[in-house]
Curated annotation (Swiss-Prot):
Pfam families named among the record's database cross-references: CENP-P (PF13096)
Gene this protein is translated from: Cenpp
GO cellular component: inner kinetochore; nucleolus; nucleoplasm; nucleus
Biological process according to GO: CENP-A containing chromatin assembly; chromosome segregation
InterPro entries the record matches: CENP-P
Native organism taxonomy: Eukaryota, Metazoa, Chordata, Craniata, Vertebrata
Domain of life: Eukaryota
Keyword Nucleus tagged: yes
Keywords: Centromere, Chromosome, Coiled coil, Nucleus, Phosphoprotein
Function summary: Component of the CENPA-CAD (nucleosome distal) complex, a complex recruited to centromeres which is involved in assembly of kinetochore proteins, mitotic progression and chromosome segregation. May be involved in incorporation of newly synthesized CENPA into centromeres via its interaction with the CENPA-NAC complex.
Record organism: Mus musculus (Mouse)
Subunit structure: Component of the CENPA-CAD complex, composed of CENPI, CENPK, CENPL, CENPO, CENPP, CENPQ, CENPR and CENPS. The CENPA-CAD complex interacts with the CENPA-NAC complex, at least composed of CENPA, CENPC, CENPH, CENPM, CENPN, CENPT and CENPU.
Name of the protein: Centromere protein P
Length: 286
């Protein structure tokens, strides 16, 4: 083999080696490009998931803010809630009607009153309409010393009226807070005349005369809920005076005092009427 032939074959081998290297580099480049594209997809997916997570966090903060606002506005704080659903079997005559029975359970409080509710809602859906009714309602409330609430809860259960329950309980608690603050105000203003034997949460306030020992007035302030769930205050005046004073009361002032007090309430309102009565009874005309 002459020198030219050897040189030609050496060049062909070198070209073949270079071609193999080029193919290897091309394959590596394709793999790198594929890896880069995969990385871009993963990065894009991670970015989208991160944005979605940020949106969820933002929505959660918004819901927490709304929940806090509604709790402050209404006074209700719901602590626990659960729900179950059962599809109700329907008869042949109701085959076009879908019925779902929802069982709800929740507990919470409205200021000092705690409650537990269990109720069932039957949802009925046809081609024309969708409706729902409460089929059962059970209410447990504490503290139980509020006799008005016990009677009210029984009526709400009978009527299966959740809206009435929440609305009436809200206003009942508002009136209780107002009564407590009013009693506290007069106790601080007239400490030697006003007595709250059961504290500011009591429904009774005693007014004792500092000039005539044995003369007392008792304000009985009840908060009532009627059959329709309307909440309103009911204030009565009781008198405690010595028997001898009753015999000397020719103008029947003591006897007619409760009726006169109700008239005073209608003219002046609760706080002004109580203040006027206390000043009159204690001899404080300032």
């Amino acid at each position: 083999m002459d020198s030219e032939t050897r040189e030609l074959r050496a060049l062909e081998a070198e070209v073949a080696a270079l071609q193999r290297e080029c193919r290897m580099l091309q394959n590596a480049g394709e793999k790198a490009s594929g890896a880069w594209k995969s990385f871009q997809k993963i990065s894009q997916s991670d970015s989208e998931e991160w944005e979605s997570l940020k949106d969820l966090r933002s929505q959660l903060e918004h819901l927490r803010s709304e929940h806090s606002f509604l709790s402050k506005l209404t006074g209700f704080n719901i602590r626990n809630y659960s729900k179950m659903e059962d599809i109700v079997n329907t008869e042949e005559t109701e085959k076009d009607t879908k019925k779902v029975l929802q069982k709800h359970r929740l507990s919470g409080n409205c200021n000092m009153v705690t409650f537990q509710l269990e109720f069932e809602v039957l949802e009925m859906e046809t081609k024309e309409k969708k409706s729902s009714i409460i089929t059962d309602l059970s209410i447990i409330m504490e503290p139980t010393e509020y006799s008005e609430l016990s009677e009210f809860a029984s009526r709400a259960e009978e009527k299966r009226d959740l809206l009435m329950f929440f609305r009436s309980l809200h206003f009942f608690v508002e009136w209780c807070e107002y009564r407590e603050n009013t009693f506290k105000h007069f106790k601080e203003k007239y400490p030697d005349t006003v007595y709250l034997l059961e504290g500011t949460c009591s429904h009774c306030m005693e007014i004792r005369s500092t000039r005539q020992p044995g003369f007392e007035l008792v304000i009985v302030w009840k908060i009532q809920i009627d059959e329709e769930g309307m909440v309103f205050p009911k204030l009565d005046l009781l008198t405690k005076v010595p028997e001898r004073a009753l015999g000397l009361d020719k103008n029947r002032v003591i006897e007619t005092a409760p009726l006169s007090f109700r008239s005073l309430l209608g003219v002046l309102g609760i706080e002004a009427a109580l203040d006027s009565l206390i000043r009159l009874f204690s001899g404080d005309n300032n």
